Amino acid sequence: GGGILNSAAKLRGMSEDELFTQAKARLEVMMAQGTVAVEIKSGYGLTVESEIKMLRVVQRLKKELPLRIKATLLAAHALPPEFANDRDAYLDLICNELIPQVKAEGLADHVDTFCETNYFTVAEMERVLEAGAAHDLPGKVHVNQFTSIGGIQAAVKHGALSVDHLEVMEEADLDALTGSRTIPTLLPSCSFFLRIPYGPARQIMDRDLPLALATDHNPGSTPSGNMNLVLSLACIQLRMLPEEAINAMTMNSAAAMGLSEELGSITIGKRASLIITKPVPSLAYLPYAFGNDHIDTVLIDGTPVRAGAVC
């Protein structure tokens, strides 16, 4: 906690092995809670060396653990202190040095930017997305967490795979998403922890948009990777039906990660990565009885990573 820059200062002082050990332990907990695929972002290094360190750890985690992992370069997360008086120089570093190196080493699948008042402007976000596209790294964007500044419209224009947060939405934002290929993603456990407004799930779904759900697991605003909590918050706070919430955190989240062909539904030809619950009276009981552990078994690629009574 303590903000992005505080977390970045701590991460810079950690070795790659320390970072790997801590991240591996968190992912093992998440797998036991039913997560079979995860996107891991950098963004807490804010230097070439530390951002690369984070992404190299992600590659180690991919090799060590069975769950599907996507890596995202989020160097445009906050302005580091050493560039406090020269924003353009930091953007130059990201676009001209960091993105090419990340691509050359095969360290990331996407680029991301925190496009928000007091962080990065729409024009700066567009610059990062353009640099990513030039190196075949599709964009994802943190946007509309606190204010609506036109980031969604620009993200859609640049073909971003997803726009994430969306606690503050205006009609123009919904208009931009309607008919696009960009997936809107809400992060209700972030709203819960920060005590900020929840995203307008029903407004988004009323536009027939494929709403996705995720945790936003990070040290400053969501110190939890538990998707079971997200399911309960989606139904209790976002007013989603259980079927809608489960669809959002499976099929639509897979689409937001670019994994629709592999994951998101129990379908012939896809990976056998799924959970089997303990006996429950109905689907609605899963979000209703919040805080309880309803999972019996977790399978990833057909192999139990948490074996219960049925395995």
Label each region the model flagged.
Residues 31, 95, 103-104, 133, ...:
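Non-catalytic positions within long, well-ordered alpha-helices that form the structural scaffold/packing
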Residues 138, 148-265, 277-279, 283, ...:
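Active-site-adjacent C-terminal substructures of enzyme catalytic domains
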